[in-house]
């Protein structure tokens, strides 16, 4: 009963507002089979050779690229994940004109896969992997294909041989200022 009341209240808020901004994180994508970080089944409660916050740091990417990409491919990229009801409902709200934008901490790209157009990805996206040499961009499937690797399992750019870095914000890195400013601007317009 309590959950039903909350859903009705949420629907009332949606129906009575015109400039909605949705701010979400890992919980939105768990129904799509993507684990969060802090729940009982989350990444922080699983056993790895190093803690996840270490493996997802910039210094670990630099010093242990093979282990970084092994973890990244196995635990951060979910090529088979599909948008769930929440992703689809948000895209529907955007199409109706009620939703200004989605601000997300998720890196899975499921909001866009559901049809959302204005998505501020605070932590980046696994679907963009950038050559640090020439700036070429490769998708997640390319990184997971293992077609272009050095001898350590680290993806390298076929155009220039430069190392690839996922366009995700790692520990020790700052958020993208343009993304942050866009999200703050939209949030300030929300009613």
Region locations from a protein language model:
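Conserved catalytic core of sirtuin-type NAD+-dependent deacylases
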Residues: 1-191
């Amino acid at each position: 009963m309590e959950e039903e009341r909350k859903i009705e209240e949420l629907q009332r808020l949606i129906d009575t507002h015109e400039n909605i901004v949705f701010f979400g994180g890992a919980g939105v994508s768990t129904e799509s089979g993507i684990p969060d970080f802090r729940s009982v089944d989350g990444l922080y409660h699983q056993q790895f050779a190093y803690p996840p916050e270490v493996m997802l740091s910039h210094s670990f990417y630099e010093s242990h690229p093979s282990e970084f990409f092994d973890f990244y491919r196995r635990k951060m990229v979910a090529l088979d994940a599909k948008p769930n009801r929440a992703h689809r409902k948000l895209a529907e709200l955007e199409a109706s004109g009620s939703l200004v934008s989605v601000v997300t901490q998720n890196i899975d790209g499921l909001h866009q896969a559901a049809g959302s157009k204005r998505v501020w990805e605070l932590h980046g996206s696994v679907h963009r992997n950038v050559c640090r040499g020439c700036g070429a961009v490769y998708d997640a499937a390319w990184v997971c294909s293992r077609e272009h690797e050095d001898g350590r399992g680290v993806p390298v750019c076929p155009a220039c041989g430069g190392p690839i870095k996922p366009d995700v914000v790692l520990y020790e890195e700052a958020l993208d200022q343009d993304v942050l400013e866009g999200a703050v601007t939209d949030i300030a317009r929300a009613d």
